[in-house]
Amino acid sequence: MKPLQTNFNLLTYLYERKEIVEDTLNKSIPRGNPTFIYDSIRYSLSAGGKRIRPILCLASCELAGGTMEMALPTACALEMIHTMSLIHDDLPAMDNDSYRRGKPTNHIIYGEDLAILAGDALLAYAFEFIATQTKNVPADLIVKVIAQVAHSVTTSGLVGGQIIDLSSEGKSDTTLETLNFIHIHKTGALLEAAVLSGALLAGAKEKDMNRFLRYAQNIGLAFQIIDDVLDIISTEEKLGKSIGKDLKTQKATYPSFWGVEESIKQAELLVEEAKEEILYFDNKAIPLIAIADFIVNRNN
């Protein structure tokens, strides 16, 4: 295999796509009445963040032969769903967090009732946005994408992971197998949906979809391992959210099983496996390869 190009600038790539995603998100939900629910929705949706899920969706679509325009509605929908999950995650009945993306959490500003409804609305808006805004993609592929994204939120995805996460809190007998289950579903499912939906929109073949799947599964788990590490070694200012909470609530984490250094090694191994899956695409894979490296080397 010929060597991959080395002049790719990941920071520029991430910045440009983040700007496109945020511009589209800002226009995606126009203000209406009652205004305060829109204020609550937009407070969290415009709070920043890495926008890694939408960027993965755009990158996989382009790698599979599609265009950014084809994938942009789904990319933004994924960010709406991710934002919904953060709003609901932060509620007192869930993780009870008061600080997210460098700001007070949604329910601290708008109350628990509006926070719940804002999350509900974002979930519905996400699927409406895919269905009404996706252009130049066959209808059968749009249906497949909607099914893929929806599945990532069900009890086989994000919800299932959150349920086991909540029920494991404070227990000293949580196994590594259970921890993997939690994060394959709670964190990994939406990252997986981002990669797969982008490829689906471009009409990727089944053998290529399997490569995208294995790439996504590996980076999803690596992402969570590094999140657990950062909760120990980073600062609240860098992360933009509360730190040390896992330790306080006696929640099982990868460092609690392996320690910090071994956790980082395991994440690096997963990223190498992810990259191996898409080297098949040669230079077209460079953005996804660089994003995989970013996931394990990030500091927030």
Swiss-Prot record:
According to its UniProt record, which cofactors does this protein need?
Mg(2+)
Superkingdom is Eukaryota
Q: In which pathway does it act?
A: Isoprenoid biosynthesis; geranylgeranyl diphosphate biosynthesis; geranylgeranyl diphosphate from farnesyl diphosphate and isopentenyl diphosphate: step 1/1
Sites binding (2E,6E)-farnesyl diphosphate sit at R100, K186, T187, Q224
Give the similarity note.
Answer: Belongs to the FPP/GGPP synthase family.
The cross-references to PANTHER family, in alphabetical order and at most eight, read: FARNESYL DIPHOSPHATE SYNTHASE (PTHR43281:SF1)
Q: What is this protein called?
A: Geranylgeranyl diphosphate synthase
Provenance organism: Cyanophora paradoxa
Ranked from the top, the taxonomy reads: Eukaryota, Glaucocystophyceae, Cyanophoraceae, Cyanophora
